[in-house]
Regions:
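SH3/SH3-like beta-barrel fold
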Residues: 198, 211-215, 223
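Substrate-binding surface in catalytic domains of secreted glycosidases
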Residues: 292-299, 343, 366-490
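Extended acidic/polar, glycine-enriched regions
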Residues: 222-238
Length: 496
């Protein structure tokens, strides 16, 4: 009986053992699969969103852009709009000539679509190409020649890696013999690229066990923290932009504007400045653009310049845009208008012997800034050829005038004059200082954020406003007083 029971129990035991073994194998297999890194790769074209053989992905400062470049004749080109807004605004599309104007320290070059005479790619193609849909493209190799950036092109899949920002950039080195950069932070995530020991990666973000990185050839993904070194800062580099040599003075500029509206005003200059001390530059309001073709009016006087020079002062003739017949937003878009203004100014400068030009174009609209910048580039290039200083007046940087691109202006011109006054003006809703100390401090601080301190001249007012507020009324009025008037008013109140 017992023998029979043993015989019956044996198969059951075997089955139980088999069940345990199968279960254990399943658990082991599950655990192995769970912790085994995935081996599947993500297709490069899918990662870079490339849909055809001529599309080129753009990776800028570690970010894959929606914007894409194109291959033309096997070489990478980027749309003009991208180049101008993201890489180098010196590439300026001129609607009148239907070409790209490139202003450098050597002058202005005109790059016409399809013309390789002025500039061409390493492969001999024109620097600028225009597609049938009207889109204008610029060779990235040509852009690199004139722009402060690092750039590399890779094929299979087509992509361009660009860096034009270096502040706060860190890198890490691969320490494992082999490692993978994955699409997401997890061992099952798709592999984007294999990396080898010693490879340098752009370090973007720390996520504990995983770090966000970018490979040298443009793949941004995640790598296990244990596979790389501690991040280290990349040494700051000196900008390699085209060097626009400034014409500067080895002393501080102490400038006064002279409101000169007639020949009589010119004649009064010597008497007005006879007892003036410390001033080494005088800027008379001699020139104004009077119409849409770029005609300028002039009160320039060689005798005025001679007297100023005898007193040890330079003369920087001022040109304004105050005539309503001239609209800089639309009129400066024409190369012929810009050229006409510049030619007349330089002819006047040569005739009267003045030392510089002061540009006082005010109330600029955002739409006109690209054309204004191009005007300044062309003016400075031509003026420097005659050894003339170029200075530009600009309002105090405020949120609503940031579109002035003061840093870009400062790339070309010699001095930037911030008009640190009119904090409160005739139309202000409240009484207040024309130029309070905090207002002036802010002006200087904001200017020196985007340009060297020795390029900034701070304009302060030699006038004030006396405000009148009537009891029970919300309206306020003001009267402008010059220095003498302010002094006399102060003496009256002191005596009272």
């Amino acid at each position: 009986m017992k023998e029979q029971q043993k015989k019956k129990a044996a198969p059951v035991l075997v089955v139980l053992i088999l069940i345990v073994l199968v279960g254990a194998a399943g658990i082991v297999s599950f655990l192995i699969n769970r912790y085994k890194p995935g081996t599947e790769y993500m297709a490069g074209n899918e990662y870079f969103n490339l849909t055809d053989e001529n599309s080129v992905a753009l990776i800028q400062n570690g970010e894959l852009l929606e914007e894409q470049a194109v291959l033309i004749g096997g070489e990478p080109y980027a749309a003009y709009t991208y180049v101008e807004s993201q890489l180098n605004s010196c590439f300026y599309w001129d609607e009148e000539t239907k070409g790209i104007l490139l202003t450098t320290s050597g002058g202005v070059q005109t790059l016409l679509p399809g013309d390789a005479a002025v500039a061409k790619t390493p492969g001999g193609q024109p620097a600028v190409q225009q597609e049938s849909d009207g889109t204008v493209y610029i060779s990235l190799d040509v852009v690199k020649e004139y722009t402060d950036l690092d750039y590399a092109y890779y094929s299979d899949p087509n992509r361009v890696v660009i860096r034009n920002e270096w502040d706060g950039v860190e890198q890490a080195t691969v320490q494992s013999d082999t490692a993978q950069v994955r699409q997401k932070g997890g061992i099952k995530s798709l592999i984007l690229a294999d990396v080898q020991k010693g490879d340098t990666l752009l370090y973007l973000e720390n996520l504990d066990n995983w770090c966000k990185v970018m490979t040298a050839d443009g793949y941004t993904g995640y790598i296990q923290t244990e596979d790389i070194s501690e991040p280290e800062a990349i040494e700051a580099r000196t900008a390699k932009k085209d060097s626009y040599e400034r014409i500067t003075r080895d002393h501080k500029i102490n400038l006064v504007w002279h409101q000169s509206t007639s020949t009589e005003s010119n004649d009064a200059m010597a008497e007005m400045t006879a007892e003036m001390t410390g001033v080494n530059v005088i800027s008379p309001t001699w020139f104004s653009v009077t119409d849409e073709t770029g005609t300028i009016s002039s009160l320039a006087s060689a005798d005025y310049v001679k007297l100023a020079h005898e007193a040890g002062r330079e003369v920087w003739g001022l040109i304004d845009n105050f005539n309503e017949a001239f609209d800089e937003t639309t009129d400066l878009a024409y190369a012929s208008v810009r050229s006409r203004i510049i030619e007349q100014l330089l002819a006047e400068a040569a005739s009267c012997g003045m030392d510089g030009i002061n540009v006082d174009f005010e109330n600029l609209k955002e739409a006109g800034i690209p054309h204004y910048l191009q005007f300044l580039r062309e003016l400075t290039s031509a003026a420097h050829a005659q050894n003339l200083v170029v200075s530009v007046d600009t309002p105090v940087p405020q949120a609503y005038t940031m579109y002035y691109q003061r840093g870009e202006q400062a790339r070309f011109v010699d001095y930037m004059i911030v008009m640190a006054y009119d904090e409160h003006f005739a139309g202000s809703e409240e009484a207040g200082s024309v130029s309070s100390l905090p207002f002036v401090q802010q002006a200087v601080e904001e200017m020196t954020r985007v340009m060297p301190a020795d390029q900034v001249i701070c304009g302060i007012p030699f006038y004030t406003r006396v405000w009148t507020e009537k009891f029970g009324q919300s309206a306020i009025t003001s009267e402008v007083l010059g220095m003498d008037g302010a002094k006399n008013l102060s003496l009256i109140h002191i005596s009272e």
